[in-house]
UniProtKB/Swiss-Prot annotation:
Gene encoding the protein: sfsA
Gene3D superfamilies recorded: 2.40.50.580, 3.40.1350.60
Domain of life: Bacteria
Family, similarity comment: Belongs to the SfsA family.
Source species of the chain: Xanthobacter autotrophicus (strain ATCC BAA-1158 / Py2)
Coiled-coil region list: none
Signal peptide: none
HAMAP family: SfsA
Lineage, broadest ranks: Bacteria, Pseudomonadati, Pseudomonadota, Alphaproteobacteria, Hyphomicrobiales
Disulfide pattern: none
Protein name: Sugar fermentation stimulation protein homolog
GO molecular function, one term: DNA binding
Length: 237
């Protein structure tokens, strides 16, 4: 995924109300930007941090700038981290289509945002007449408290636990059900669960795994020009 226009640099003043942040641009202008991230963003929202913003194509949008990247140091030097949770579905779909995720390759069709169950949508659905339906749910990972070890979630997520339950139900039907955890921290070497931050999610994960839900860890390569899936990394559970 390449950013369609050059990103705009700035410094974070503060993040508030989850979806808003105040930023000072290089020319000294202060502006409010959209934050497409409902998580706690632990370690990523320190005032003064360098940030990169994208400009919306829709000129009529109330907040034309969106927060895309932040510079953070998790103990191994400064690096860029992706904070926009709208991108992971596309990033994983691109990686699957390119054959970069062997466990999910070889399907005849890839569809996104497909309705399933009673009132849900699956991020990615892989279809092939020769094998069971494969439903893929994607989660963005941007928490790191130990160098190299990324964690999910960074706050309580009842919605995330619901997704695990729904995937478990699909596995019970004989469909293939997969959770993909995508780290937008490029220095991640493995991904695990932040069970201390959301014990209920940890329990839901364990139940889903027992029912046959698979878990795949991926890590991104990030720069101001774009983001792409770089590698498969272990899921430690």
């Amino acid at each position: 995924m390449r950013f369609p226009t050059p990103l705009i640099q700035g410094r974070l003043i503060r993040r508030y109300k989850r979806f808003l942040a105040d930023v000072v641009l290089a020319d000294g202008t202060e502006t409010t930007v959209h934050v497409a991230n409902s998580g706690a963003m632990l370690g990523l929202d320190a005032p003064g941090s360098r940030v990169w913003l994208s400009r919306a194509a829709n000129l009529a949008r109330k907040l034309p700038l969106s927060w895309e990247l932040v510079e953070a140091d998790f103990g191994a030097g400064a690096e860029l981290v992706g904070v926009n949770t709208m991108h992971p579905n596309l990033l994983v779909a691109e990686a699957i289509a390119a054959g970069a995720v062997p466990a999910l390759s070889g399907y005849a069709r890839l569809r996104r945002e497909v309705k399933y169950g009673l009132s849900s949508r699956i991020d990615i659905q892989l279809e092939d007449e020769a094998r069971p339906l494969c439903l893929v749910e994607v989660k963005n990972v941007h928490l790191m408290r130990t160098p190299g070890y990324a964690e999910f979630p960074d706050c309580v997520t009842a919605r995330g636990a619901k997704h695990l339950e729904e995937l478990g139900a699909e596995a019970d039907k004989g469909n293939r059900a997969v959770m993909v955890y995508l780290s937008q921290i490029g220095s991640a070497r493995s991904i695990g669960l932040a069970r201390d931050l959301d014990p209920a999610y940890g329990r839901a994960f364990d139940r889903a795994r027992e029912r046959g839900v698979e878990a795949i860890g991926l890590v991104c390569r990030i720069d101001p020009e774009g983001i792409e899936v770089a590698d498969i990394i272990p899921m430690t559970g």
